[in-house]
Amino acid sequence: MQTYQGIIVDAIYRRKFKGEIAVEHGKIISIEEKEHDIEQYILPGLVDAHVHIESSMTVPSVFARMAVARGTVAVVSDPHEIANVMGEEGIDYMLEDARKAPLKVFFGVPSCVPATPFESAGAVLDAEAVDRLLAREDLHYLSEMMNFPGVVMEFPEVIAKLESAKKYGKNIDGHAPGLNGTDLQKYVGAGISTDHESFAYEEAVEKIKLGMNILIREGSSARNFDTLYKLIDEYPESVMLCTDDSHPDTLIYEGHIDKLLRRGQEKGLDIYNLIRAAVINPVEHYGLNVGLLREGDPADFIIVDDLKAFNVLKTFIDGSCVYNDGKVLFSVEQAPAKNVFNRNKISVDDVKLAMPASGNNGEQMKKIRVIVAQDGELVTGQELALPKVENGNLISDPARDILKMVVLSRYADDPVQIGFIKNIGLKKGAIASSIAHDSHNIIAVGATDEDIVGAVNRLVENRGGIVVGTADNLIDLPLEVSGLMSTLDGKEVAVRYEQLNEEARKLGTSLMSPFMTLSFMSLLVIPELKLGDKGLFDVTKFEFVELFAGE
């Protein structure tokens, strides 16, 4: 038996007291009030209620080392990204690698692979496959149902997946940005219980009043905490905290769920409500085998120096100390590489786009649809603009910050799709990535055609990863596992990734996380205008549109 003394934070009964907990065989066997001089705080370990581990660009066992250092003892994870590339084989890869580390990872079954029928993916998880996966005990819920039009319009394939989850008694996660009114009522009525895509306070309140749980997301790109934080005190039983997509530099230097407890207190939120959102609500909602600092619970807890500073000193999982005083106390063997990548290099001719003959004379020139990126958001706007034309071809216009963007399939040598985007900010060079939600094709944006092609071809040579630079001066981060994750240690990935971000900033971008923002510009389920490997897509209309706008 081992004992630990400190100021015990009981979020269930909303009290703090000096005491001692006793741990034996991985369980808390007693919690007693006891006088002592120790000023450190003991509280339940933190839970990320929705995360795609792949977005850390590290495999689960390496992600675990970063997470426990921030007081996280469990995550609810959707292996959606790797499933889009490798299907069930990718899900099994994540499960197997996660078992190498003590972090409690509760994987779900991806519900939308591919996310839409309007893009090329490496796999399809149809209703039959989803039913088979939901029957497994090592997969715990149906992951975010992004196809909200399919739910509302009762597409048979979509409804079959929802019914499978109900049959096995497993929760259904939602994904419904901007959905409201009768459509939202129908979506919730289909059995969907959570949403992490609320961008407005009023939107989140409407969902809560219909019975949904709102997951407040604060990742590397999508950051909704400042908009939604008041919900934690106003609806304490209906809110959880999550990161969704967090890059390694964010995890190591900013923090994980711990940073939201610090920021929440700075905003005047009740500490017990914050702990409820960070631990109790996800454990109870998903039925996780994670301790809540009660007698008989698994001994999953953390020790921090001070509640407001919230510096994690120790992390315990099942009674074992996995992090102590700046050191992670478990190591993992390097994961094997695994990938699907069938693309060959491209040429400058592949990214050329000729101006239609009817639009070559002055004011009669047709305007093009331009994607308008928004820093820190997954949603985009759209606007019409006159293109810059040189030698009869449409080119990037860095002076107006209207840049050419391309998306091309990683699974076959299909034609390159071309669009234009605003607010990336590059004055020269290009950035490219094989992380391109959700099918993870190749996406690139740049100041010249030559720079775009150079970045894409370096990425093809590496069979996935991220690239930045000019055509004759490129730096990269290869991602050997499905073009999404590195097999390196988290710190190594974070350092290299920050080098790439810094290089992108030198080339002109002011985006907080340029690669993360770029990776969502082909996500055809989040409004308003996106570019996929089959063309320009209006998410609001849920249909392809021409680059050149009609009169």
UniProtKB/Swiss-Prot annotation:
EC number of the protein: 3.5.4.2
Cofactor names: Mn(2+)
One Pfam family this sequence matches: Adenine_deam_C
Catalytic activity: adenine + H2O + H(+) = hypoxanthine + NH4(+)
InterPro entries, per database record: Adenine_deam, Adenine_deam_C, Amidohydro-rel, Metal-dep_hydrolase_composite, Metal_Hydrolase
Enzyme class: hydrolase
GO molecular function: adenine deaminase activity
Keywords of this entry: Hydrolase, Manganese
Biological process annotations from GO: adenine catabolic process
UniProt-listed PANTHER family: ADENINE DEAMINASE, N-ACETYLGLUCOSAMINE-6-PHOSPHATE DEACETYLASE
HAMAP family per the UniProt record, alphabetical: Adenine_deamin (MF_01518)
Stated family: Belongs to the metallo-dependent hydrolases superfamily. Adenine deaminase family.
Protein name in the entry: Adenine deaminase
Gene designation per UniProt: ade
